[in-house]
């Protein structure tokens, strides 16, 4: 399926705000790809599809994951909105005909991250955080700047802020997010 065809389909599937965010992530991912010498086309496609399952009601997310043998951990059962990443990778492959394993993986890990992420994984994770429609994060101007300089330091900053935000609100922190934070925190300390 071509990028424009996917955009038209997503415009019908997502609510207006989510569609605008998706376009922002797509273009931001393309810019980051250019800055870090990665395929702009692959980054834009992954950015466009990263939230393709976001507007599915949470009970349906659980049902679809169970039906399609997508593993759900206890934190995801408690916070099923997290499932949109795993389910999104599944839908990108089965509905939007994406076969590139790098794109599918970037969609799958864009919410929790994982230790030692690929270049595309980091581009999508970061683009989701810094796209122009985002304005709530405390360190956003700094994070946007370093996104174009050092993706690993940027990951460390985003994960630090995300962890602090979730802790301050009493939210559950997914085990994978904890491992991702530990990986990038250690990486940053070694390279400061």
Language-model-derived ranges and their functions:
Residues 7-12, 35-157:
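Divalent metal-dependent catalytic cores for phosphoryl transfer on phosphate-bearing substrates
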Residues 16-18:
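A short, charge-rich alpha-helical start-of-domain segment used by transcription regulators
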Residues 21:
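N-terminal glycine-rich anion-binding loops that anchor highly charged ligand groups
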């Amino acid at each position: 399926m071509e990028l424009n065809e996917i955009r038209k389909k997503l415009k019908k599937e997502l609510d207006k705000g989510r569609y605008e965010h998706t376009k922002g992530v797509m273009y931001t991912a393309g810019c980051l790809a250019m800055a870090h010498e990665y395929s702009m086309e692959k980054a834009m496609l992954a950015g466009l599809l990263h939230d393709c399952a976001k507007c599915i009601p949470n009970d349906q997310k659980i049902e679809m994951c169970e039906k399609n043998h997508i593993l759900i951990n206890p934190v995801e059962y408690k916070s099923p909105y997290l499932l949109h990443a795993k389910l999104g990778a599944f839908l990108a492959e089965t509905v939007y005909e994406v076969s590139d394993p790098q794109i599918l993986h970037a969609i799958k890990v864009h919410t929790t991250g994982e230790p030692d992420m690929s270049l595309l994984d980091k581009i999508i994770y970061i683009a989701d955080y810094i796209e122009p429609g985002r304005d709530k994060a405390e360190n956003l101007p700094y994070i946007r700047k370093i996104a174009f300089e050092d993706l690993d330091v940027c990951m460390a900053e985003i994960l630090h802020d995300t962890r602090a935000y979730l802790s301050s609100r009493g939210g559950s922190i997914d085990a994978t997010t904890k491992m991702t934070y530990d990986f990038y925190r250690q990486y940053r300390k070694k390279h400061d």
